[in-house]
């Protein structure tokens, strides 16, 4: 099946960050086979021609760190620091989850993400009360591209920890897929919730199965103080000593890093998922993304969960990310528009090991989203497309979402998920949680 999308303004996010004012994209099945400017007059014979009527077409957004199973917990524990927020609000509520609640919560997060332009994401879920196969089936049904990882903790007895490791290894062996729509990573929660032995076992599983690692690291000053007091090392050095960085690793946050740590992370291909809104809301601080990029670290933007954000709008994350860097450095050139877009598209895709997506180029997966600026005053005049995408647009502006060549959202309607049922069930299950 060959489909041509014509009469579009195409934000390619190729090496030149080229914007094609009037162009077309040809998709064959799940792959982009041509991207050109001008009227459609291709040598390709196509099955369908779709007039985009001047819509902006850009790569699907890539969320490098989130927790969709937590989506029912939006608004729980506002105005709290990370540790008391986790210990007194989030974990007690997660302990009440059943497989049905977990699926309903996941569906809500998936619906919000895909309708706001996210096509790929990397996720960590707490396995308590969760049917992991049902979660993967739910993500698959959404049509999204994802790395969904089972989180490991050292809570409970040593026997509990051993069982968690065994189950995590089985999960990795079942779901790891280097190039498919769904994959997984090895995901120890953090250095403050995992024993040294568990972190070492996670490193072993990652090496033996050739998977990536996903972990919360260097998120707060308290974490750095506590880990240094307990192990005599800061979190980065401690994680490295456990062997975690033998495989490409995504660290969520990286708020509290010094220059030598940034250099070390770059040298060892440790990537950072930058969560600006979540870090601000939990009072964790502001990650120095400018310094990370200058050190050579791969960085991707992320939302974290709705419990600490409180939405999954990647446009909002792009905007706050660039504004924060300008503010903390008192430098209006810090994290310019093109860089912010890169960190939410092709750069983010590279962070989570999905190089097959993130830009609109021949050979890439057909993952793209559209915005119709014609009826949106906040996107007018419509000639400064890149600026408007970062500084004016929001996830509510999305018209269409195509993932792997399939129309997942079309004219604002999700084709893969039952929006009415999902919203009803989310409200019903949320009322049943004991706060």
Swiss-Prot record:
Chain residues that bind Zn(2+): 65, 67, 216, 304
Alphabetical keyword list: Hydrolase, Metal-binding, Zinc
GO molecular function: 5'-methylthioadenosine deaminase activity; metal ion binding; S-adenosylhomocysteine deaminase activity
Entry EC number(s): 3.5.4.28, 3.5.4.31
Cofactor or coenzyme needed: Zn(2+)
Free-text function comment from the UniProt entry: Catalyzes the deamination of 5-methylthioadenosine and S-adenosyl-L-homocysteine into 5-methylthioinosine and S-inosyl-L-homocysteine, respectively. Is also able to deaminate adenosine.
Annotated HAMAP family: MTA_SAH_deamin (MF_01281)
Family: Belongs to the metallo-dependent hydrolases superfamily. MTA/SAH deaminase family.
Stored NCBIfam families: PRK15493.1
Name by which UniProt lists this protein: 5-methylthioadenosine/S-adenosylhomocysteine deaminase
This protein's encoding gene: mtaD
